[in-house]
């Protein structure tokens, strides 16, 4: 590593020269850095806006799932079976699916060796269970904080290697040399003078592990503080893929946490409170049959994400009813674990569907109030909220229908390299998932992508530019950064208000319920803001410049994602996945408003992906066919020969 302070067009900029850089300190970021180091690329650094920020460190659920190849029991499984299953969820590139499947076991075993306590039976088998969108029992878990444990174990190993860390650095621009990455610029969030504000990283192998676009919504399960950097990549010319495909689900508002699994299976009471303080048990108002209502709540535990296929008569009607109470009737919505639905002293368990009854019976939980059943079935799920200041024995839990995961993201190849040479994207920032994905598959994908990217970089290393050329290459981008600072610096600040306003509108127009006409008008609104941002956005000090650049990235991401949704809607495509597109035709759930009328997609576009390109305040879109699942395998001697020559890394 070489560090110098340069004058670039009269601006003072710190420069750092590296062979490779990882941006992001979550599970995927740490894994990428470790894989680079273990592949003998040691002139590296990890850059993060906050070492303890990020989704993988700060999220979980009642039993957070990690998805991997089956390693228990007598049911057949294979790399290709797993790849085919991942591919089958629609709009998935087969080479990514095969790579995620083939890397599943080595990445999982690595985590076990690093100390993540995935359970085994007395014979050493890694026991599994079936999760959502899982045809087998590939799921496993280390408890409510699986991804946090992963991150901490990876961090401990990372720190043992003495790899450099630049903390408090926000990615603001990617520098290009033609169609290749030449470096990137960060903002020092602690800087209080212009000459310490920006750092130019002279590096042509960049692994972006900055997570999903967490900052574009208000109702979000993503941890506060994590916003993502996809807008920075879009601005540099990185292509987006499957940007319409998200997961939305019920989650608590404070703290931000999925209320999946046991939180639903213990059959809590759903309550909304209107402006006069009156309580409404709105599920009981909608369902004519109490047994069907309770069974739907139970199913919501393992059918957690909102699924448009289950919106008419399935468990996802609950998501829509919560949405109506919160977003249309402007009521706050709560889960009450202190009282049974209908305020019953004892529930009529015989009214439950067989699956729900048998599950609760096997768990010895056919008794008491929801909190009693929770303590019986999964007391750590209670302890988790208690550790965050919420006692479910004493208070209700506010919830909403929240953005939880972006299945799309930056388009990458089979080595997780974007269309910008040298820019690799791993973790949720990468768009390797499709319309659906199994629960926990994102954690596997993050580890697999990190390993693949690091391996490719180690075999095709792009050495950094000579510093003088690097400075010249970055000149326009450096000036752009300083010009933005000059434009938004003022004697007052409106950053907070602008962020809240736009994220609330994103919830309303570009969330789980999407009206094509409203999408288009919202897209135009964001575009106008972007074009005039330097006049609209104001901050009163350099200390707030961190938020100013975050809002800039947020608006770019909001525009590109909303434009993608609007493009999808205008093409005549229909409702699929975790979003409902309002239509004049089709069906709607019984007794709900016309905004919930939709036409279900029949899968005719499952073998296509929609690609987005952002440039100069415009979004262009094109469709390409998915890459099929490769045959893989091969004649051993031939594969071995190639492996000895080039590691089969090409």
Language-model-detected regions and their locations in the chain:
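Core beta-strand elements of the Rossmann-like FAD/NAD(P) dinucleotide-binding domain
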Residues: 15-18, 193-205, 419
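An anion/pyrophosphate-binding glycine-rich loop and adjacent beta-alpha core
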Residues: 239-380, 456
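Conserved N-terminal glycine-rich FAD pyrophosphate-binding loop of Rossmann-like flavoproteins
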Residues: 49-75, 81-84, 247-251, 257-267
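N-terminal Rossmann-like FAD-binding beta1-loop-alpha1 element of flavoenzymes
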Residues: 18-46
């Amino acid at each position: 590593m070489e560090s110098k302070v340069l004058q670039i067009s009269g601006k003072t900029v710190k420069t750092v020269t590296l062979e490779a850089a990882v941006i992001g300190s979550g599970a995927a970021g740490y894994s990428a850095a470790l894989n680079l180091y273990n592949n003998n690329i040691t002139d590296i650094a990890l850059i993060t806006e906050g070492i303890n920020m990020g989704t993988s460190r700060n999220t979980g659920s009642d039993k957070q799932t990690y998805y991997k190849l089956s390693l228990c029991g007598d049911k057949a499984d294979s790399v290709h079976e797993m790849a085919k299953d991942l591919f089958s969820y629609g709009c998935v590139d087969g080479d990514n699916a095969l790579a995620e499947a083939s890397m599943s076991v080595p990445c999982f075993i690595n985590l076990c060796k690093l100390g993540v306590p995935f359970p085994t039976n007395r014979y050493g088998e890694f026991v599994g269970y079936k999760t959502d969108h899982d045809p087998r029992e590939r799921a496993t878990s280390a408890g409510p904080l699986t991804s946090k444990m992963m991150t901490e174990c990876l961090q401990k190993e990372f720190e043992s290697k003495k790899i450099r860390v630049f903390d408090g650095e926000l990615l603001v621009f990617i520098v290009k040399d033609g169609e290749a990455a030449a470096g990137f610029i960060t903002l020092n969030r602690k800087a209080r003078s212009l000459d310490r504000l920006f750092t130019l990283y002279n590096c042509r192998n960049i692994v972006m592990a900055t997570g999903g676009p967490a900052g574009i919504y208000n109702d979000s399960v993503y941890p506060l503080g994590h916003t993502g950097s996809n807008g920075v990549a879009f601005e540099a010319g990185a292509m987006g893929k499957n940007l319409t495909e998200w997961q939305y689900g019920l989650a608590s508002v404070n703290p931000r946490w999925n209320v999946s699994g046991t939180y639903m299976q213990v059959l809590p009471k759903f309550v909304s409170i209107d402006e006069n303080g009156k309580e409404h048990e709105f599920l009981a108002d909608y369902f004519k049959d109490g047994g069907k209502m309770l069974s739907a709540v139970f199913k919501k535990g393992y059918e957690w994400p909102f699924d448009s296929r289950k919106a008419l008569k399935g468990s996802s009607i609950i998501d829509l009813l919560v949405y109506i109470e919160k977003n249309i009737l402007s009521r706050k919505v709560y889960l009450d674990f202190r009282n049974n639905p209908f305020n019953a002293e004892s529930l009529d368990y015989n009214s439950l569907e067989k699956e729900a009854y048998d599950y609760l019976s096997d768990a010895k939980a056919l008794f008491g109030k929801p909190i009693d059943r929770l303590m019986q079935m999964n007391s750590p799920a209670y302890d988790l909220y208690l550790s965050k200041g919420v006692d479910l024995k004493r208070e209700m839990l506010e919830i909403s229908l929240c953005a939880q995961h972006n299945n799309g993201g930056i388009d990458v190849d089979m080595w997780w390299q974007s269309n910008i040479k040298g820019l690799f994207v791993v973790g949720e920032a990468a768009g390797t998932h499709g319309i659906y994905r199994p629960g926990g598959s994102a954690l596997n994908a993050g580890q697999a992508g990190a390993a693949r990217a690091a391996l490719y970089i180690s075999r095709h290393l792009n050495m950094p530019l000579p510093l003088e050329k690097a400075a010249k290459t970055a000149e326009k981008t450096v000036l752009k950064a300083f010009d933005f600072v000059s434009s938004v610096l003022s004697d007052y600040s409106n950053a907070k208000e602008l962020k809240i306003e736009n994220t609330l509108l994103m919830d309303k127009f570009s969330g789980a319920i999407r009206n094509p006409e409203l999408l288009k008008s919202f897209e135009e609104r964001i575009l106008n803001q972007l074009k005039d941002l330097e006049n609209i956005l104001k901050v009163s000090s350099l200390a707030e410049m961190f938020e100013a650049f975050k809002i800039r990235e947020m608006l770019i991401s909001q525009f590109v994602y909303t434009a993608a949704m609007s493009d999808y809607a205008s093409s005549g495509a229909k409702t699929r996945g975790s979003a409902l597109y309002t239509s004049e035709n089709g069906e709607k759930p019984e007794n709900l408003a016309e905004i919930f009328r939709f036409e279900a997609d029949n899968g005719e576009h499952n073998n296509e992906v929609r690609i987005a390109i952002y440039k100069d305040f415009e979004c262009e879109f094109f469709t390409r066919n998915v890459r099929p699942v490769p045959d893989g395998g091969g004649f051993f001697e031939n594969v071995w020969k190639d492996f000895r020559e080039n590691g089969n890394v090409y």
